[in-house]
């Protein structure tokens, strides 16, 4: 099966500190893959995921998308298809609805349109009623903010999710809401895939079929559930 995303000797180094953050890494993500990466804090999990998302430039190596290197002109399209979600996503001032509409004001997405029906269905998966759309973002709990950020991403119909400890700061109920949203998104289309970075081994095993481990910038594992 061909890879959606592939890395070839992808590496990152902090030149100021003369520290290796990510050893040269070969990795392939295929359609229908559910991959988890666990490891200690500072082991390089987030460094790898951010490089995969093209948020931080690698020191060396390549990220391939559909077998091809990614040109600068293709990065906005890549980021709309390969979506990164951080542990503490930023929301804009205004209501939940304002936040969900916001991506469609961006130049790269202006040809696409906000769909209330899609958002309402996603809210239901997270146990939220349509009234939730009127809440002010400043009044949301950490769990509610993460749900909004995830729905904001899922409505774009991404091919791949890159999830950087999305439930690390959440209570168990909010974590279940996030997991339910991702389960529903994945089940809706068998060609989708995700990489989930987690400090929680039980969650990693529950939410993935392929388990990888990061230690001192070295990615290893590839065990099937």
What are these regions (language model features)?
Residues 38-40:
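The feature captures the beta-strand-to-loop junction immediately N-terminal to the Walker
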Residues 113-132:
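Conserved ABC ATPase "signature" region
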Residues 161-165:
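Catalytic Walker B motif of ABC-type/P-loop ATPase nucleotide-binding domains
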Residues 89-98, 109-110:
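Conserved catalytic motifs of ABC-family nucleotide-binding domains
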Residues 69-83:
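ABC ATPase NBD coupling module
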């Amino acid at each position: 099966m061909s890879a959606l995303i592939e890395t070839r000797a992808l590496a990152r180094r902090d030149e100021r500190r003369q520290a290796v953050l990510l050893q040269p890494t070969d990795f392939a993500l295929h359609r229908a893959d559910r991959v988890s990466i666990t490891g200690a804090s500072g082991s390089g999990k987030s460094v790898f995921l951010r490089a995969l998302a093209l948020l931080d430039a690698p020191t060396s190596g390549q990220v391939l998308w559909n077998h091809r290197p990614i040109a600068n002109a293709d990065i906005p399209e890549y980021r709309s298809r390969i979506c990164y979600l951080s542990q503490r996503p930023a929301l804009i001032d205004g209501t939940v609805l304002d936040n969900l509409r916001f991506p469609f004001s961006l130049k790269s997405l202006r040809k696409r349109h906000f769909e209330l029906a899609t958002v309402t269905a996603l809210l239901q998966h997270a146990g939220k009623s349509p009234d939730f759309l009127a809440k002010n973002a400043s009044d949301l709990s950490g769990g509610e903010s993460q749900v909004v950020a995830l729905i904001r991403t899922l409505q774009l119909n991404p091919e791949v999710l890159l999830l950087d400890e999305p439930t690390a700061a959440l209570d168990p109920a909010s974590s279940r809401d996030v997991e339910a949203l991702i389960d529903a998104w994945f089940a809706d289309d068998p060609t989708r895939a995700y990489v989930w970075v987690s400090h929680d081994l039980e969650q990693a095993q529950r939410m993935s079929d392929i388990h990888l481990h990061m230690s001192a910038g070295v990615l290893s594992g590839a065990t099937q559930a």
